[in-house]
């Protein structure tokens, strides 16, 4: 679709900006800020930069409350990614981004370019990307539309990540009806760097050059930021022109070239930023804004792959694999020579200027002349008032399960789409390229070694949309806690989080209430685990025809393993190891997998959550792991105790005998703050001497059977029966063989 330019007078009367996401009041405000009627280019820039995706105009009052700093944080929110000191002169860099809207309409390219964008965020800081993770949410797996989305989105993630040579090491995939028309595609990237080489996205120093490098600019993804800041109707779902097209081989060249610049030509570099949402306007104006500088760009110098592109199209294109650098005067040819070595298109397209204006020239004509701040700091901020949704004010009665055939229920639970084995999906990703991956997908957290040290990083992504649907604040805290449990069970101490805040339309009081309450839960939990929010993004307007997704903050968390010898996995290691349950169990079923299985619904008041107890349990487990007392550790989450027990047995084909003073149904309770641990018999005394909140409930056995005694029943389940249900569920739904 070619953009047709309009005069300032026509824009004022015909109001095309309404279709770009600006309101009449925002148009008037922008005109006042720039001192004249906006022309076609200027109104386009405002539509991108004032979108929720770029300006956070509804979410910023919430985001400002996040806890973002502790003694380890070297750089927090506001740059391409956050940076945390991990000692020995090294830092870990990580961030997550959503690509929900593009993936809904063009699943392969939407997912692939989401991966590409988050990788650029990491290497723009100067870090080498070492791992990718994802967090995916889909609708009912039995629907052909969902199966199509799953297939193409997974293919897009794998196609891009595998080609660029960065391992996809972990993630999660959830299924719930609320995501049927609005799938969630959240991608996370982790990098490692020398902590004294951090780069920032700034353009400072009058006369310094702006160098564009990477793919040529085309008409793909134009106004994608505004597209990502609106909700869907069925008619709009065909808007594929707002979706970008990715080239991972170009990205690999771009990554290697930029890392050579940041690593070996630091004296030449002032700042570097990727062209993501809102394309060239976002990267350039944000770099000027951070340095309090002015900027001039000549759009005729922008490498273009299509003819007769308008300034609006050039500036708002979201063509992928592009970066913008600010280079010191006199070093331009040195930098251009590096890019030439990688056969990359690169050009000097502008300069830093005195003052604070942002000026664009096209065919020798000044087509934009606005204050930098009009597109950055002066974007509107809205202070919304939330309203508690009726389902929270008047919750339904508690779900009280009845279990007459525990083995059948157990088998059915293992086949629930959110619980079931995802290896048929993640085996399409290369998890071992770079040869640093120590713990592969399928355990509680992925683990990748830090080359040249005896240490490793653990990483995970977690979200709990059902829990937040029943209580946004408590559910969000539970999401952070589960991420931390996953890391601790792997032997890691949590360092910090990145988030993707996936919510509905913030102009609706009920949706804004969910966002604001979720933030409170995230704040409380991140403080409890000393894991500040160092980066992230918001993805609002996840609605179709007025129906919103569950409020779903995705928590990406990274932790540090001080010694490779303490890396712990969830799989049973040997027969006769003792099995301990950490934490108390209650009848917590509202929002659980068991409720979904037996009723098909998610209702009631979310069960209680003791954040302080969770923190104590995690400290205890990490201490026991670091003292080499634990042979296997698994956090309890979806499906509860019995699901976790079965998962621990599958890898080594080992069964278990357990005896618990709980009703049978409570074996599927989802009480938080719990772990299953195994301890070798010779370490029993040392483990119990720690006096932790752990109860001996049984032992691992060589026989592939799970023998369970509860207060009201004794039953035995075949490992093979449970594993078959677990492994065949998704391939069966996807009409493929396991």
UniProtKB/Swiss-Prot annotation:
Part of the phosphoribosylformylglycinamidine synthase complex involved in the purines biosynthetic pathway. Catalyzes the ATP-dependent conversion of formylglycinamide ribonucleotide (FGAR) and glutamine to yield formylglycinamidine ribonucleotide (FGAM) and glutamate. The FGAM synthase complex is composed of three subunits. PurQ produces an ammonia molecule by converting glutamine to glutamate. PurL transfers the ammonia molecule to FGAR to form FGAM in an ATP-dependent manner. ATP binds at residues 56, 95, 499, 536. It is an enzyme of class 6 (ligase). Mg(2+) 2 binds at residues 121, 274. GO terms for cellular component: cytoplasm. Monomer. Part of the FGAM synthase complex composed of 1 PurL, 1 PurQ and 2 PurS subunits. It comes from the Bacteria. It comes from Lacticaseibacillus paracasei (strain ATCC 334 / BCRC 17002 / CCUG 31169 / CIP 107868 / KCTC 3260 / NRRL B-441) (Lactobacillus paracasei). Substrate binds at residues 98-101, 120, 244, 318-320, 539. GO terms for molecular function: ATP binding; magnesium ion binding; phosphoribosylformylglycinamidine synthase activity. NCBIfam families: FGAM_synth_II, PRK01213.1. Mg(2+) 1 binds at residues 97, 537. The active site is at 53, 99 (proton acceptor). It is found in: Cytoplasm. This is Phosphoribosylformylglycinamidine synthase subunit PurL. Its main location: cytoplasm. It catalyses: N(2)-formyl-N(1)-(5-phospho-beta-D-ribosyl)glycinamide + L-glutamine + ATP + H2O = 2-formamido-N(1)-(5-O-phospho-beta-D-ribosyl)acetamidine + L-glutamate + ADP + phosphate + H(+). SUPFAM superfamilies: PurM C-terminal domain-like (SSF56042), PurM N-terminal domain-like (SSF55326). Its EC number is 6.3.5.3. CDD domains: PurL_repeat1, PurL_repeat2.
């Amino acid at each position: 679709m070619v953009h047709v330019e309009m005069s300032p007078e026509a824009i004022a009367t015909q109001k095309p900006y309404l279709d770009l996401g600006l309101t009449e009041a925002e148009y008037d405000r922008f005109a006042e800020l720039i001192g004249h009627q906006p022309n076609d280019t200027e109104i386009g820039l405002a539509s991108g930069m004032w979108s929720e995706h770029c300006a956070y105009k509804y979410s910023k009052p919430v985001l400002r409350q996040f806890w973002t700093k502790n003694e380890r944080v070297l750089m927090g929110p506001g740059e391409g990614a956050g940076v945390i000191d991990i000692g020995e002169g090294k830092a870990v860099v990580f961030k997550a981004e959503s690509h929900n809207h593009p993936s809904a309409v063009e699943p392969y390219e939407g997912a692939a370019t989401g991966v590409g964008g988050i990788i650029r965020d990491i290497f723009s800081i100067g870090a080498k990307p070492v791992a990718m993770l994802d967090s995916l949410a889909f609708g009912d797996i039995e629907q052909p539309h969902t199966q199509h989305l799953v297939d193409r989105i997974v293919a897009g993630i794998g196609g891009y990540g595998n080609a660029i040579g960065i391992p996809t090491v972990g993630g999660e995939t959830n299924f719930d009806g609320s995501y049927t028309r609005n799938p969630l595609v959240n991608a996370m990237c982790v990098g490692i760097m020398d902590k004294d080489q951090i780069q920032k996205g700034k353009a400072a120093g009058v006369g310094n050059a702006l160098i564009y490098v990477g793919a040529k600019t085309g008409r793909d993804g134009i106004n994608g930021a505004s597209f990502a800041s609106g909700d869907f109707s069925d008619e709009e779902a065909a808007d594929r022109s707002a979706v970008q097209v990715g080239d991972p081989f170009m990205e690999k060249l771009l990554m290697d070239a930029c890392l050579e610049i940041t690593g070996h030509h630091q004296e030449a570099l002032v700042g570097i930023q990727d062209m993501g949402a809102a394309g060239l306007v976002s990267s350039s104006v944000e770099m000027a804004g951070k340095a309090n500088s002015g900027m001039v760009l000549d759009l005729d110098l922008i490498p273009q792959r299509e003819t007769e592109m308008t300034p609006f199209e050039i500036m708002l294109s979201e063509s992928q694999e592009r970066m913008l650098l600010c280079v010191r005067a006199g070093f331009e040819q040195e930098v251009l020579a590096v890019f030439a070595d990688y056969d990359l298109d690169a050009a000097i397209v502008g300069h830093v200027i005195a003052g604070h204006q942002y000026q664009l020239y096209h065919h020798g004509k000044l087509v934009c002349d606005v204050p930098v701040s009009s597109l950055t700091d002066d974007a509107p901020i809205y202070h919304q008032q939330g309203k508690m949704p009726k389902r929270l004010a008047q919750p339904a009665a508690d779900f009280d399960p009845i279990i007459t055939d525990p083995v059948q229920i157990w088998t059915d639970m293992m086949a629930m789409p959110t619980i079931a084995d995802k290896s048929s999906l993640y085996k399409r990703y290369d998890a071992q390229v770079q040869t640093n991956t120590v713990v592969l997908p399928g355990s509680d957290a992925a683990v990748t070694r830090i080359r040249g040290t005896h240490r490793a990083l653990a990483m995970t992504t977690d979200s709990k949309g059902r829990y937040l649907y029943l209580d946004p604040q408590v559910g969000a805290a539970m999401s952070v806690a589960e991420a931390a449990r996953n890391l601790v069970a792997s032997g890691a101490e949590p360092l910090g989080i990145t988030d993707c805040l996936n919510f509905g339309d913030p102009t609706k009081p009920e949706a804004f209430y969910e966002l604001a309450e979720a933030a409170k839960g995230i704040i409380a939990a991140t403080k409890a685990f000393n894991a500040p929010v160092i980066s992230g993004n918001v993805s609002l307007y996840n609605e179709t025809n007025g129906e919103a997704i569950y409020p779903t903050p995705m928590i990406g968390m990274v932790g540090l393993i001080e010694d490779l010898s303490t890396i712990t996995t969830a799989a049973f290691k040997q027969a006769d190891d003792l099995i301990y349950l950490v934490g108390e169990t209650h009848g917590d079923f509202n929002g659980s997998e068991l409720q979904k299985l037996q009723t098909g619904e998610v209702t009631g008041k979310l069960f209680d959550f003791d954040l302080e107890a969770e923190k104590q349990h995690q400290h205890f487990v990490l201490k026991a792991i670091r003292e080499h007392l634990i042979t296997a550790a698994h956090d309890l989450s979806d499906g509860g105790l019995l699901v976790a027990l079965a998962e621990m047995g599958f890898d080594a084909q080992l069964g278990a005998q357990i005896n618990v003073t709980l009703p049978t149904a409570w074996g599927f309770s989802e009480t938080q703050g719990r772990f299953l641990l195994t301890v070798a018999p010779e370490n029993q005394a040392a483990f119990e001497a720690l006096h932790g909140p752990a109860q001996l409930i049984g032992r691992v056995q060589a026989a592939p059977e799970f023998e369970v005694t509860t207060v009201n029943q004794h039953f035995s389940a075949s490992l093979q029966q449970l594993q078959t249900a677990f492994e065949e569920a998704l391939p069966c739904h996807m009409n493929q063989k396991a």
